[in-house]
A protein has these predicted regions:
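Junction motif at the cytosolic side of a transmembrane helix
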Residues: 221-242
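Transmembrane helix segments
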Residues: 29-40, 164-197
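Aromatic- and glycine-rich beta-strand/loop motifs that create alpha-glucan
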Residues: 1-25
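Short hydrophobic, aromatic-rich alpha-helical segments embedded in or entering the lipid bilayer
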Residues: 3, 187-208
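Secretory targeting signals
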Residues: 16-17, 21-67, 97-161, 180, ...
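Helix-capping/transition residues at the boundaries of transmembrane alpha-helices
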Residues: 10, 86-88, 154, 158-159
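Short loop-to-helix capping motifs
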Residues: 13-15, 91-93, 162-164
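Helix-loop-helix units of permease transmembrane domains in multi-pass membrane transporters
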Residues: 66-105
Length: 242
């Protein structure tokens, strides 16, 4: 618990993490307002579809939680890196990574729940055709799981690269600008089982894909991707010098 608390404090000290939290909270609600003004019916996924862009904030948090450890500090701090101090304080690299993953998961979970409450309330107030109730709670849990798994996936990639540039660029572009995963579905149906597409089935019911995936199956597939990527990151981290 102490290690998780320490990681939460480190995360809270990062300006980029606060900016990401703001994005995760505000962006989905803003998208919901804009969509409510359109004349197009959004169907069963109204409100929940608006929560998808908020995962950008989760990605940023997952990345900076790891990449900040490798940033070279200022001259007044000796020009060292946080990772050296962290591994000096925590002898076990396994415990260090587990605490960091837990801190990321807790932070992102709280943001997902807060963003879901704000966005779905906004959707209900701005679109009279949409009604959100207790029956949608499993989908809110799905959104939360999707955000957490995406953040952990981003952290795993960053463990390998040690830099936030590559994972941030790829993940954000893939999630918001041009979905490489979706384009790949035009070539092979197996692309539907890539983590971002499979995970969306956790909370969306009208996913435009060539394969029908149940919510639980989508979550398990995405979870497996996270285990594999995080496992590779863990092995690389264990064998590499700080």
């Amino acid at each position: 618990v102490k290690l998780i608390h320490a990681e939460l404090i480190k995360l809270a000290s990062l300006l980029s993490a606060w900016i990401a939290a703001g994005l995760a909270t505000i962006l989905p609600a803003a998208v919901a307002v804009l969509n409510s003004r359109s004349q197009v019916s959004r169907g069963i996924d109204a409100g929940f579809q608006d929560l998808a862009p908020g995962v950008i904030g989760a990605i940023v948090i997952g990345v900076v939680a790891v990449s900040s450890e490798y940033l070279v500090e200022g001259a007044e701090s000796g020009g060292g890196r946080q990772i050296t101090t962290s591994l000096t304080a925590v002898a076990s690299r396994s415990r260090f990574l587990l605490a960091k993953a837990a801190a990321v998961a807790v932070t992102v979970a709280l943001l997902a729940l807060l963003s879901s409450a704000i966005t779905l309330t906004t959707t209900s107030l701005t679109d009279e055709t949409v009604s959100v109730g207790t029956a949608d709670l499993p989908r809110v849990a799905g959104v939360t799981a999707y955000w957490i798994l995406t953040a952990l996936l981003a952290s795993g990639i960053t463990l390998v690269t040690r830099s936030g540039i590559v994972p941030l660029t790829f993940c954000i572009v893939n999630m918001s600008v041009v979905s490489v995963s979706f384009l790949l579905t035009k070539l092979t149906s197996w692309a539907n089982y890539l983590p971002d597409l499979a995970g969306m089935h956790l909370f969306l019911r009208d996913v435009h894909g060539s394969v029908d995936i149940a919510p639980l199956t989508g979550g398990l597939v995405m979870g497996l991707w996270v285990v594999v990527v995080a496992g590779i990151g863990f092995i690389v981290f264990r064998r590499r010098d700080a």
